[in-house]
Regions:
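Cross-family detector of peptidyl-prolyl cis-trans isomerase
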Residues: 1-331
Length: 331
């Protein structure tokens, strides 16, 4: 729900991937709504993917463990090298999916670590094929199983090109090495994951708890709309609690309290929504803050926390809005 139409899509701008830097750079504090401070990677050639060479992982070999990677030996391949270290058994990734990954990246020739998510205790989330990460990632991470650990050797043509990334100490001749754990993937068929919560208040809308990727049903009671914000679990996930400064990846559906008519939904578009809680109407920012990732939440937004006396497409002025929101990930 955004102030000028219905949903504000926030560019991901993942500094840790589109522009690597060490932990002291503050990249882990970057807002997804901010512009990257690094140059956009050059388009990569579409070439073959080879199986090596890649340097050995010397410790932290299990999925989820922070790895230590040896210095590269000899000359790296000019092609994109990808080795499956651990093959997962989860769903298969596809272009336009949102991926959630843990990773560590370093320079082939020096083993200098550029960036890692393991120390931040928070996976990175980005969309495949949307230019949010270096081209080597966009190509290597398609058609992989969630639960897999991959090791990549990414030559300059698939990373930052001949210009390199001087701010991070990456020369135009540097091959980059990454270990990547594929934690999860999300797309237009994703749903909340968690425990169903009883909906016993007869004065509130009822939301279905289906998790098949189809739009939930929302049944609005023929009663007076609440004057205050309502935020209740339909499905309670087990992820971290959302902070008011977070940006989220969600599925949602919105209907009018007055007649139950749908005015917007991600499900009909077949794509997820991403937004910062600082850039949406107050009913969303207040209603989702403190809720757990993985949850489905019923949010009833009174006019003073929504669009007030301003009409929007499909939304009359002074409308009470009813949403169900699946919180899939924090960006």
């Amino acid at each position: 729900v955004r102030r000028r139409s219905v949903l504000l899509a926030v560019p991901a701008g993942l500094l840790t991937l589109a522009g690597c830097g060490d932990d002291k750079s503050g990249s882990d504090k970057a807002s997804p709504s901010k512009e990257p401070t690094s140059p956009t990677p050059s388009p990569a050639p579409t070439g073959k993917i080879v199986s090596g060479p890649v340097p050995p992982i010397t410790s932290g070999e299990d999925f989820g463990d922070k790895p230590k990677i040896a210095k590269g030996a000899g000359k790296p391949s000019s092609d994109l090298a990808v080795k499956t270290v651990i093959k997962g058994n989860g769903p298969t990734t596809a272009k336009k999916d949102f991926l959630q990954v843990n990773y560590l990246g370093q320079i082939w020739s020096s083993a200098k670590v550029l960036d890692t998510s393991y120390d931040k205790k928070k996976p990175a989330t980005f969309q495949l094929g949307a230019g949010q990460v270096i081209p080597g990632w966009d190509q290597a991470l398609v058609e992989r199983k969630v639960g897999s650990r991959l090791e990549l050797a990414v030559p300059p043509a698939y990373a930052y090109g001949k210009q390199g990334q001087p701010q991070a100490g990456i020369k135009g001749t540097d091959t980059l090495v990454f270990v990547i754990d594929l934690v999860d993937r999300f797309n237009g068929k994703s749903s909340a994951k968690g425990d169903k919560v009883a909906q016993s208040n007869i004065d509130l809308p009822k939301v279905s708890a289906n998790t098949d990727g189809k739009a939930p049903t929302i049944t609005v009671p023929k009663k007076a709309a609440p004057k205050k914000l309502v935020s209740e679990y339909v499905i309670e996930g087990d992820g971290p609690k959302v902070k008011k400064t977070d940006a989220l990846l969600v599925q949602y559906k919105g209907v009018l309290w007055k007649n139950g008519k749908q005015f917007d939904a991600t499900y009909k578009r077949g794509e997820l929504a991403q937004f910062s809680l600082q850039q949406v109407v107050k009913g969303w920012s207040q209603g989702l803050t403190g809720k757990k990732v993985g949850s489905r939440v019923l949010v009833v937004v009174p006019p003073d926390l929504g669009y007030k006396d301003e009409a929007k497409p499909g939304i009359p002025a002074n409308s009470t809005l009813v949403f169900c929101v699946d919180i899939l990930a924090v960006l």
